[in-house]
């Protein structure tokens, strides 16, 4: 299913010129990715490993990381971003844009009313010291273009780059960061699974190896390690999750590997 907001911003991107960057998350699907192949001087930045792999397969320059625009090492004429679900991610991208734009470069921001696009437009106008040029689409969809005039105070990104202790279980601290679903919570369903796993360990003993698919910040892996599991392989599609999980592995000395998948 195509995303109208992403279609809208990609159409605007195709009408622009110069060095262009599309910041992409889970909204970007393979069919739209194929249409981007024809755009010259286009780069992608994504925090989703599947998007990165698809871009590679289609020979589109792409960087996979935790939404760090500076890693592109380029000054862009256009940075285009279809707003994400998480406010901290949106603010983080907006805050970085001025440092990676050319002197006359522009930021394109697109989203729906129920995603807070009206508020984001107002905040960016204050931050960049400019008035947005706004185009409207169907179903209260808006596309805004900004040019940096005078920088104000950056937006609150919840200290996006920082890993934070969000709690402790079984005497082990749990670290996480913004940029992933449920980053500052301990999922109740996962807690139930850990309790069931503990009962299993009491009966059958701890497993020598364990695979944690969609590991998030690593809650299940850390708890499995606390309950005696041996080598643990943890994977996730999200760059923020991978960074968080790796940190938890390192501080607790967990034997195993955390990888993107």
Map each language-model feature to its residues.
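Conserved SAM/SAH cofactor-binding pocket of Class I
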Residues: 3-59, 188-261
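Conserved SAM/SAH-binding loop
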Residues: 65-70, 261
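A short acidic, Gly/Pro-enriched loop at the edge of an enzyme's catalytic core
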Residues: 68-78
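A short SAM/SAH-binding and catalytic strip from SAM-dependent methyltransferases
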Residues: 78-89
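SAM-dependent Rossmann-like transferase core, predominantly class I methyltransferases
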Residues: 139-205
């Amino acid at each position: 299913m195509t995303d109208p907001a992403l279609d809208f911003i990609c159409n605007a991107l195709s009408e622009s010129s110069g060095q262009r960057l599309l910041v992409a998350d889970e909204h970007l699907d393979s069919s739209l990715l194929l249409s981007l192949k024809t755009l010259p001087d286009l780069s992608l930045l994504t925090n989703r490993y599947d998007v990165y792999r698809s871009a590679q397969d289609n020979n589109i320059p792409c960087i996979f990381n935790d939404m760090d625009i500076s890693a592109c090492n380029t000054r862009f004429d256009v940075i285009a971003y279809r707003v994400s679900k998480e406010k901290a991610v949106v603010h983080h991208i907006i805050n970085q844009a001025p440092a990676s734009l050319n002197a006359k470069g522009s930021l394109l921001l697109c989203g729906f009313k129920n995603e807070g696009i009206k508020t984001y437009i107002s905040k960016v106008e204050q931050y960049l010291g400019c008035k947005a040029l706004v185009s409207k689409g169907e179903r209260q969809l808006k596309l805004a273009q900004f040019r940096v005039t005078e920088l104000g105070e950056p937006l609150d990104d919840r200290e996006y780059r920082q890993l934070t202790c969000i709690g402790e279980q079984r005497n082990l601290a749990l670290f996480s960061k913004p940029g992933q679903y449920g980053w500052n919570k301990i999922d109740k369903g996962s807690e139930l699974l850990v309790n069931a796993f503990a009962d299993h360990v009491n009966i059958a003993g701890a497993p020598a190896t364990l695979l944690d698919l969609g590991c998030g910040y690593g809650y299940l892996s850390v708890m499995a390690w606390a309950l005696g599991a041996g080598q643990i392989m943890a994977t996730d599609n999200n760059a923020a999750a991978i960074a968080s999980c790796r940190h938890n592995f390192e501080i607790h000395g967990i034997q195993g590997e955390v990888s993107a998948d």
